[in-house]
Amino acid sequence: MSHVAVENVLNLDQQFAGLDLNSADAESGVAGTKGRYIPPHLRNKEASRNDSNWDSGRGGNGYINGMQDDRDGRMNGYDRGGYGSRGTGRSDRGFYDRENSGWNSGRDKDAYSSFGSRGDRGKGSLFNERGSGSRRTDDRRQDGFDGMGNRSDKSGFGRFDRGNSRWSDDRNDEDDWSKPLAPNDRVEQELFSGSNTGINFEKYDDIPVEATGSNCPPHIESFHDVTMGEIIMGNIQLTRYTRPTPVQKHAIPIIIEKRDLMACAQTGSGKTAAFLLPILSQIYADGPGDAMKHLQENGRYGRRKQFPLSLVLAPTRELAVQIYEEARKFAYRSRVRPCVVYGGADIGQQIRDLERGCHLLVATPGRLVDMMERGKIGLDFCKYLVLDEADRMLDMGFEPQIRRIVEQDTMPPKGVRQTMMFSATFPKEIQILARDFLDEYIFLAVGRVGSTSENITQKVVWVEEMDKRSFLLDLLNATGKDSLTLVFVETKKGADALEDFLYHEGYACTSIHGDRSQRDREEALHQFRSGKSPILVATAVAARGLDISNVKHVINFDLPSDIEEYVHRIGRTGRVGNLGLATSFFNEKNINITKDLLDLLVEAKQEVPSWLENMAYEQHHKSSSRGRSKSRFSGGFGAKDYRQSSGAGSSFGSSRGGRSSGHGGSRGFGGGYGGFYNSDGYGGNYGGSSQVDWWGN
């Protein structure tokens, strides 16, 4: 019995010896080093594995480190889904093959070897995402290849970023952010398929531009007049921007020269690209700087704080997402990764997105403060600060949060960082804020400050409250079926009620206001933009910054209580050189804005109804005894750089003799709806005999 056992042991020893399991030299080449078990199906491949680069890009020590052993009960590299999510079963959707420079949908190709694993931490794997099989709620058109970070890249400055969605083929150029990465037809189609140009640029260029400040850089006439690098110029071409708008002609060289800027331009004038283009071009030229070194030394996955190089603050989530989408376009084929955070969305998902890396952050003030207090965002290395729609942020009560972000945290002080403020209006309060935030800034006024575009024909109609719905139906019936109409109301309840009324009247419509979920708001905007619901009922939440092209008609069903809100509402039409119409329902509830509305109509060379002139005259006499301040639109404080006194330096970027007259700027309009503008108030007859219709045709 024992003899048989001993014999069996000897036979086993002989069998193990035959398998050469204990030969350290055979495997490691180092005497005295204990060998490791090699599965039978891999023994013949071991010698040639390094020559074939099977584990290229995985940064591991061979098969065991490059790919997780199934014995630990976790998914291995082949089980991970094509979007980096574990076990999602999407691995056959296609991967980018670095060696073949194309999309590779084969399961047995080396594209899998670029997926990192537990053994890759700190070894520079190129593509990996932890637990993100679901798409982010705010990346509506984003796919899994569009810029995900990786676990091993603690800094977030990896070679694969959301804004560019590209592999970096040349590792020697890894630190050169100015060189574009490889193109990708699919992402290119996704980002640049829409139209971005207006139809009336010849007249649009006639708008005068005034730049005030010391040593103001000369303006440009073409994007080629200033050096912005290969990446930016390529993306400008893809975006089909043929030439800069007036605000871009002046703002881009000012920002390139690293000057602070306070710019006032009409809505829809290209303000977003005016600051994104020069900021991104400087980031590409300078690289990440100290931010990457700091993150590499101190970052830990899941707990690290992100340090964006640029911060853009916006008042609403819609505007923040819109700026973010533009940033994605201009960050295409670069190493810069844009991110966006805003209230009303899952903060956990936004934190996970930030942890994958963030170089340019677009945020609403409230959510950014939340992220900073959670230790997820640090502004220590922020070189560029942008306040977009600054007056609107103050109107919404964000000044404490803005001052907390800019003055009471770790953001570099003015003079060290570069700060830009953009808005359609700049009343005195905003200019005082600019004095605190900006350093030796240049004041840029495109057109008249606080004015409206002459591409917009403005009509003010006296309509009693009980007649508003009937009058609205008449306007909608006179509008072409393919025309987009934006109807503004004052309250959320009013928006829902009006949408319900129009729906039961047979009109395809949708609505958007603050009580709607983010998903509902995005869906409503999509339905409106696509023309499926050509009527959008909205509160002021949609009035600022939304770039909805081809809006033919804006209707103020309820006029706002202040004239600046009126400017922003009607600015939704006539954008970037297009022509539009704005109709406002006026009655005794709106007397408080009579004088300002009259001044605005006169300034924009619009026809003024006689009843409005009479009301403004009466209102002026009533308020004179109370010492009423000068009108917002009568050339007062907000209409120029308040630093100007006698002899202040200024330069005029355009010597043309004034703005274009736009669409029907001074023509009569008593037309298809009869005489609305007689002194008796609402003029009744919808079937006027004039040959000029409501649209000025």
Swiss-Prot record:
UniProt-annotated binding residues for ATP: 241-248, 265-272
Localization per Swiss-Prot or TrEMBL: Cell membrane; Nucleus; Cytoplasm; Cytoplasm, Stress granule
Residue ranges occupied by any Helicase C-terminal domain in the UniProt entry: 455-616
GO BP annotation list: cell differentiation; gamete generation; negative regulation of extrinsic apoptotic signaling pathway via death domain receptors; negative regulation of gene expression
Keywords: ATP-binding, Cell membrane, Cell projection, Cytoplasm, Helicase, Hydrolase, Inflammasome, Membrane, Nucleotide-binding, Nucleus, RNA-binding
Phenotype upon loss of function: Morpholino knockdown of the protein causes anteriorization of embryos, that exhibit enlarged heads and eyes, shortened tails and defective melanocyte and eye pigmentation.
Coiled-coil annotated spans: none
GO molecular function, a single term: ATP hydrolysis activity
Annotated organism of origin: Xenopus laevis (African clawed frog)
Name assigned to this protein: Putative ATP-dependent RNA helicase an3
Biased composition (Gly residues): 655-666
Low complexity compositional bias, start-end: 645-654
Pfam families documented for this protein: DEAD, Helicase_C
SMART domains on file: DEXDc (SM00487), HELICc (SM00490)
